Structure formats: structure tokens, C-alpha cells
């Protein structure tokens, strides 16, 4: 198909909304809050998915009837049935797919529109332990629409294991007419660039260089600026 309309939980007006979008009365502007993979096994957590059919036994079913999951004695708990280890660590969702540069069906933050948007060069300043970012978004297509502008950060030459990029902020424009522009600005507290340091049991900020990225999805970055902290 040329496109797929994903109309989750539209409520009683969901049908009317779908018709409005398909007929061109309204321009879709939603973005995915997850990554759609090519294969289920591409998920880093795939090996730890619970309720593997091969693990279901008569003994296990009887145990679940006798002991609710919260009351199962520790000696009888079964891995990936009564409990699961999150071996993916901080590489959850798009953080894993983007860090490994895996091919995906639809990336995190992706969404189609009947129009196109142009991003002006970012303006960036650091003040009061906050990264202030602003840029203009222009509707350069023939159809009115809204854009969800996404801001990601990347630590260069990190001394710890961390994702290649992480979403730190986003902003949605108002409905823009053809050739209409609007200024979008966000504030990212520098503390948001910290990582959880298990050695000191607290948040720590890595000194050094960071990339500030902006784009329409995690795989559609329009520009990058480098800062030093």
C-alpha cells in the first residue's frame, strides 16, 4: 500500500476522523511513540519475552491455579514466566534500533503528512543550566498541516554504554497554511543529559561534546549542532 492509517482508540468520533483524513478534509499529524520492527526477533528484549509457548506445561498451569503470581513461592518461580530480567538495560525501544542501526519498518517518531515542512537553521544558547533551542518551521507544501518537531541528543566519545541518541524534547506546531512559518522553541535542562551512575547511586553528567539534533523522526534528522559542556 502507499500508506497505512493507524487509528488507535479513536473513541465514538473515531470513524468520522478516519473519513476526514482519508477524504483530505484533515491532514494527519500524529507520530509513532514506538518503533515498528522488520522482525520480532530484532527486539533486544525478544529472548526474554514471557509466556513462550514451549514453556507452558501442565505443572505450570496447575501451579498458577494454586498460587496467584504474586504469591508463588520463590522456589517455584520460573524465569520469563513469573519474573523477567531486563537484559536490554537502557537500550529500550528506539535506543536499541538506532544504536545498532537496524533496519526497521517504521522508525520512532515517524508519521506521514499531506504536506512538507522546511526547518530553518537552529539557534542555540546555554543559560542557567538550560539549553535553549529555537528554529522556524515552514509549510512548503500545498496542504495545511501540523508538524511534530523532535529534539535528540548524542554524547560524543562517551566513556559509558549509552544510546546513540535520545529524545529530550518535542513540540507540535499549530495548523500552518501554505508558506506559513512559525517559531518553535524548547528548553532542555542540562541535567536531562545525565546518566544514572551506579557507582555513586546518583545522576552524573559527562563533560565533553554533545550533538543536538532536530528532525521529523529518529531516522529523519535535518540538522545537528555540537555543544561543549
Please identify what each model-predicted range represents.
Residues 1-146, 154, 207, 211-215, ...:
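Secreted, periplasmic, or luminal enzymes acting at the cell surface/secretory milieu
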Residues 104, 145-147, 159-161, 194-196, ...:
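Short acidic, gly/pro-rich beta-turn/loop elements at beta-sheet edges
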Residues 124-126, 174-178, 205:
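Hydrophobic beta-strand core residues of beta-sandwich domains
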Residues 130-132, 181-185, 222-224:
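Intrinsic-disorder/low-complexity, polar/charged segments enriched in Ser/Thr/Lys/Arg/Asp/Glu/Gln
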Residues 131, 147-152, 163-168, 198-203, ...:
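Composition- and surface-driven signal marking solvent-exposed, interaction-prone regions
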Residues 159-198:
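Intrinsically disordered, low-complexity Pro/Gly/Ser/Thr-rich segments with frequent PxxP/GP/PP motifs
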Residues 189-229:
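Terminal connector regions
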Amino acid at each position: 500500500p502507499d500508506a497505512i492509517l493507524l487509528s488507535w482508540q479513536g473513541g465514538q468520533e473515531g470513524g468520522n476522523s478516519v473519513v476526514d483524513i482519508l477524504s483530505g478534509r484533515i491532514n494527519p499529524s500524529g507520530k509513532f511513540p514506538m518503533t515498528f520492527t522488520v522482525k520480532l526477533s530484532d527486539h533486544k528484549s525478544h529472548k526474554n519475552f514471557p509466556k513462550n509457548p514451549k514453556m507452558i506445561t501442565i505443572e505450570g498451569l496447575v501451579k498458577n491455579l494454586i498460587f496467584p503470581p504474586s504469591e508463588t513461592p520463590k522456589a517455584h518461580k520460573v524465569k520469563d514466566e513469573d519474573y523477567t530480567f531486563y537484559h536490554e538495560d537502557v537500550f529500550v525501544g528506539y535506543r536499541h534500533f538506532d544504536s545498532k542501526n537496524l533496519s526497521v519498518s517504521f522508525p520512532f517518531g515517524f508519521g506521514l503528512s499531506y504536506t512538507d515542512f522546511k526547518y530553518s537553521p537552529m539557534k542555540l544558547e546555554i543559560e542557567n543550566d538550560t539549553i535553549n533551542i529555537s528554529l522556524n518551521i515552514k509549510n512548503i507544501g500545498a496542504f495545511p498541516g501540523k508538524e511534530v518537531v523532535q529534539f535528540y541528543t548524542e554524547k560524543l566519545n562517551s566513556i559509558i554504554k549509552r544510546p546513540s541518541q535520545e529524545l529530550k524534547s518535542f513540540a507540535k506546531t499549530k495548523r500552518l497554511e501554505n508558506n506559513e512559518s512559525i517559531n518553535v522553541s524548547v528548553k532542555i535542562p542540562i541535567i536531562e543529559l545525565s546518566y544514572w551512575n551506579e557507582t555513586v547511586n546518583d545522576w552524573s553528567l559527562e563533560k565533553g561534546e554533545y550533538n543536538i539534533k532536530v528532525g521529523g523522526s529518529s531516522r529523519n534528522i535535518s540538522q545537528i549542532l555540537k555543544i561543549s559542556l
